[in-house]
């Protein structure tokens, strides 16, 4: 069986029309960029971005921070290359293929003043452990800022399945309560909840958009529906309005200035 991370990376490798369909990701990137601009980062901050994709977040934050050393990383070599093509002429940015859940850096790379991620950490297999690893790469006083998806995301698609006695292949996103309860080395985060709704022309358009942004990877235990069953689900989805919710949670974790954490 192909490992989940390999399937996810492969999905993003094939997401050639990502920019045309990732509307929600773009909106949240703009919001994250405004929050980054408001942080007291100081001169020449070192920034690590996890899951850079095609560069939405860096583009939204461009020009707002002076003297930045911004390391853009992604698990997908194709996405890293697209970001490199977009920003490669700038001395501000560097690029690397990295599994954000298991980051491996030379000692000279860390610590970072800011670690950020837009719509990336929900792919982690163990979210709290993965975030804790990132948190430990921060300097004292540094910030971990990220957006992720919560329970309720694509609820309309799941409801269309459940109404017919089927199970959708969408991942089981954590509840808001589970996310807010996470402590990284004992540190509590500041969380904000938001819900964005996208309406599609039809069910095929919705599924095409998911594949285009690399989000069509089903959960590992999902058994695909027959063609006839899928047509029933698509019809039900369209009858309900062909809308899909994105339940977005944005978090800010500050590493204490006090003695180094374990």
Give a label for each model feature.
Residues 1-16:
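N-terminal, positively charged/glycine-rich alpha-helical extensions of SAM-dependent methyltransferases
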Residues 104-115:
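A short acidic, Gly/Pro-enriched loop at the edge of an enzyme's catalytic core
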Residues 23-43:
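Conserved alpha-helix/loop element of class I SAM-dependent methyltransferases that forms part
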Residues 141-203, 216-226:
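Conserved catalytic/acceptor-binding region of the Class I
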Residues 113-126:
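A short SAM/SAH-binding and catalytic strip from SAM-dependent methyltransferases
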Residues 128-140:
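A short glycine-rich, Lys/Arg-flanked "PGG" loop and its adjoining helix->strand segment in the class I
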Residues 24, 54-56, 190-262:
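Conserved Class I S-adenosyl-L-methionine
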